[in-house]
Amino acid sequence: MQIFKPEGQTILTPSNRAALSSPNALHEACITNETLEARALLCDKEHNLRVDLGCMYGIIPHNEGALGIDDGSVRDIALISRVNKPVMFKIIGFQKDDNDREYAILSRKAVQRECMDNYISRLCPGDVITAKVTHMENFGVFLDIGAGINGLLPIDSISVSRIPHPSVRFSVGQTIRVVVKSIDEQGRITFSHKELLGTWEQNADEFAPGETVPGIVRSVESYGIFVELTPNLAGLAEYSAGISAGCHAGVYIKSMLPERMKIKLIIVDAFEAEYPTPPIKYFTELDHIDKWVYSPAGCSKIIESDFS
């Protein structure tokens, strides 16, 4: 299966630079049907994209801007939002403008069609791939899974520990690993992420009763305060006034109960702070997962994901 990278990851490669180095090189890339990448300079009033090719400019006509733009399944914002960003394309021809300057006619849609036929259409639930975060909403993360084609990672599938917004975990432009959760009849893919962040036991093995460790307050309830120790592990401390969600904390681990997936904590201190988002720790390098069981063996409550 051919792998297609997200937009922005090939623009600085030697082969891409060589293809943009001269008109002759661009003509050769047209003949060989090579996929190239360059920066979109503007989107005109007809929503054609103008692209900087270095030795000349290129135009991506509106109907060549994206797969699905013709039938309306992809909106024009998908083109407008590419301005000042890299776009992938194939050169489908050359023309002269009113000033007798040669320019290239480009197709982004052709690259996306190739990506869909040779890569995305062959994915199945449980496949683990890399993707790039393109933008975030309250409900989830939009990912470039190849050639500018997007998929969705819902917020409740990012981690076991609940979060208020995806920006707690990710940043725009970040490359992450995700697992294919489902594919609908239109070929739209929904992803998950929490299955790659380790089981309860794998995360709990990094801690021990008697330790005082850092955490983040994720939820304050009348019966207690949930503190995240890792993205896939949280514990419960007694309620204390003046502590709110988002606070950083130092917590003492009182006990750990694998058979109930419970960690009892004592909050030593809680405070407001701005710390860098820690790097993601993945617990598996597999490229496919059939089933993932979060719960420890013998636990009465079963938390699992079945992709088979």
Where is each model-derived feature located?
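Single-stranded RNA-binding regions, centering on S1/OB-family and related RNA-binding modules
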Residues: 1-308
